[in-house]
Structure formats: structure tokens, C-alpha cells
Amino acid sequence: MNRGDIFAKEFDTDPDVSTDSNYNNNNNSNNNNSIISNSNNNNNNNNNNVDDTDIEKHLYKVLLIGDYAVGKSSIIKRYCTGIFSPNYKLTIGVDFSVKDIEWEKNKIVSLQLWDIAGHERFGTMTRVYYRYAIAAIIVFDLSRPSTFDAVTKWREDVNSKVVLANQEPIPVLLLANKSDLSTSYVDSEMLDRFCKENNFIGWFATSASNDTNINEAMHFLTKEILEVAKTNHPPKPEEDTLELTKTNGEKSDDSKSCCK
């Protein structure tokens, strides 16, 4: 997949995947593997320019969780915009961005990336934030061992609050972030063993600062999501959906943090 095939956008509507006006929910056998999808393939279209209605679209909600200041926001910003800034204000509650991927001809896969605050005072809201997610990423900071110690806590939190339609756990990817720092050390054998013991689908050493393994990790997760979505699609949203206001990437005026 060429980088030129990847582009990013943000929705101008409520981030709840159940209410996005850009996608229509078609529950047919060929198109029941995404949260919201729109497929109207025209095999007789001989035009070189493909109309938007001929493009198959799938939207998937993905959680990014982990302790505060591990770099979740920086990873999302790097992936969605290609930009890194050393100074970020801490996420308050939840933020979100959407990344559109031209996965194959006439097929767009959109990842709705939910940036969940890592502060304990927001822990009571995670059940609401996790709703309808099809996958998750847990991030820890290689330069702060305590953030790795918390990974198991976050994994258990996900397991207890969100599952696939068949009641199996959602796929979870582990990111060992800030690999560019001189104080960072990656024990590959230990992480391989840890992921196997705790049912992670895999792990990547990443750096938003140096753009290391960000696209590779997301591509790996997207492949897993598409495989899972063949037989599992999230349940229909209930009426008591969470109302959020799109922030356009702006953070609150809390203390600044350097998150690579």
C-alpha cells in the first residue's frame, strides 16, 4: 500500500459512529462487517472517475488507551496528519480523529481513533467511551517502567467493558512508545512472551517523534480488524448514545506534556 493512497479527514458531525451522516447502515450479507457501511457497486461503470456512491465504505471505532503522557495523542496526530509537535496539552476525557485509508480500489476503510484520557479521574467514564469499539491499542512509555506495569490493568479494563458480537474479546495491539529516547530499552523476548500470555495480537516499538512504526502498526491492526469484521460486527447502537463535541484537534488548557 502506497503512502499516497492514505489520506486523513475529520468528521464535522457527532463522533458517535451510530449517528454519522456520511455512512448508511446496510445490514446485508455482503456488507455487515463494519460499524457503519455504504456499498453501491456499479459493475457497468466504464468511467475512469469513480463516483462516490460506487465506493464501499467501512467505519471502525478503535480505542487508544494507556497511562497519561505515554504519547497516545501524538501517535494519533502523526498517523492522521503526518505532523509531530513536542508540546501537547493533556487530553481531558476523550478526543477523536478519523483516518481514511484507501485499502483497495473502490474500498475506503475509516478508523475512528478515540484518544482516551489516562488520568484515573476519568476512569469511571471508560465504559461509555469503549462502547461499540471493534479494536483497541494500549500504549506504554518505554522510558517510564510504571506505564508498562499499568498495561495489564488497561487490558483487564477493556476485557470487562467491551466484546465482539460473538462475546469474544476485541483484538488489542500493544505499542511500546518513545523508542527514540536514549533511556528506552526494548526487551523483544519479554514482550513476545507478555503479549502471548495476555492475548495481545502483537506489539510494535514506536516513536511519534521519529515516525517509527506508526503506519506499520496501524496497517497491522487494520488487517486484523477486517479479518474480525468478516464474522463479527458490533451490536446496533442503543438510543442512549454518548454526545460529544468535535474538538478539531484542540486540547484543553491543562498542563502541557511532551508526548512522543
UniProtKB/Swiss-Prot annotation:
GO biological process terms held by the UniProt record: intracellular protein transport; melanosome organization; vesicle-mediated transport
A molecular function (GO) term: GTP binding
GO CC list: endomembrane system; trans-Golgi network; vesicle
Basic and acidic residues: bias regions: 248-260
Region annotation (Disordered) ranges: 11-50, 231-260
Sequence positions that bind GTP: 66-73, 115-119, 177-180
Sequence ranges of Low complexity compositional bias: 21-49
Lipidation (S-geranylgeranyl cysteine): 258-259
Signal peptide positions (record): none
Record keywords: GTP-binding, Lipoprotein, Nucleotide-binding, Prenylation
Motif (Effector region): 88-96
InterPro entries noted in UniProt: P-loop_NTPase, Rab29/Rab38/Rab32, Small_GTP-bd, Small_GTPase
PANTHER family named in the record: RAB FAMILY (PTHR47981), RAS-RELATED PROTEIN RAB (PTHR47981:SF39)
Family named by the database record: Belongs to the small GTPase superfamily. Rab family.
Name of the featured protein: Ras-related protein Rab-32B
